[in-house]
Amino acid sequence: MIYEVELSEQADNDLRGIFEYIAFELQSPENASGQLDRLEEQILSLDIMPERYRKYENEPWKSRGLRVLPVDNYVIFYIPDSNKKVVTILRVMYAGRDIENQLKFHTKQSETITSFSANM
């Protein structure tokens, strides 16, 4: 079954921040484009069998169904809803960050969710 993939406002900001950091801080726009392409490709792949990646191991996120998709040095956090056939991308973060602290401040209720397509 094909799922619709949605991107939270925070995840969209995360992707923009990753691109800007690599392109401008590291002065490598080609690498920034390549990294963004790889992240987008993996996000879009979640339209089929999104449960194939592991659940996040810590509560309260584990019981909420949060899953983790590693891509290079980054992790994509998402929740699949099998009833609605929707995958919501919550965060995209550098794997070396304090992930617990970043997730603690994330509240889905305050998020704006948008449909995700390859034409970001």
Predicted regions and their residues:
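Basic, Lys/Arg-enriched alpha-helical interface segments
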Residues: M1-K62, K108-M120
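Basic side chains
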Residues: R38, R52-R54, R67, R91, ...
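Basic/aromatic recognition patch in beta-strand/loop cores that engages polyanionic ligands
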Residues: M49-N83
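Enriched for short, Lys/Arg-rich terminal
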Residues: V71-V75, I79-M120
